[in-house]
A protein has these predicted regions:
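Flexible "arm" and connector segments at domain edges
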Residues: 1-68, 72-116
Length: 116
């Protein structure tokens, strides 16, 4: 990933504006947003279905971009609906993961933290 900003506040604001202009917030309960995230994640997974591990990047990049964008957009809307600050919750999760997966135990291992 580039060392640029992950996501500009302007982009987050555009997502919320798009939703609000259509008066869709009334339909965006945490349950329905979680379902939508799961469905869009499944569509992202479908991009890889029946493909070899070494064939994905260039051939499927456009579909990957669209489906990943959908997952992220719904994630932004869920955070907004639940009053969560994206930067704060991501930083908190990184701290928790660092505790679960200390470098000295997790480096070069793919196992879950309970198996390290």
């Amino acid at each position: 990933m580039r060392k640029e900003t992950f996501m500009k506040q302007e982009t987050i604001d555009q997502v919320i504006k798009f939703r609000d202009e259509r008066n869709w917030k009334q339909f965006h309960t945490p349950k329905d947003l979680a379902i939508s995230i799961s469905l869009e994640a499944a569509e992202l997974l479908e991009v890889f279905q029946w493909s070899r591990d070494d064939v994905w990047c260039e051939e499927k990049m456009e579909n990957m971009r669209e489906e990943l964008a959908d997952v992220l957009i719904y994630g932004i809307m869920m955070a907004d609906t639940c009053g969560m600050n994206l930067d704060e919750i991501i930083q908190e999760k990184i701290r928790k993961n660092a505790e679960k997966y200390p470098v000295e135990k997790a480096r070069d291992h793919k196992e879950k933290y309970t198996e390290l």
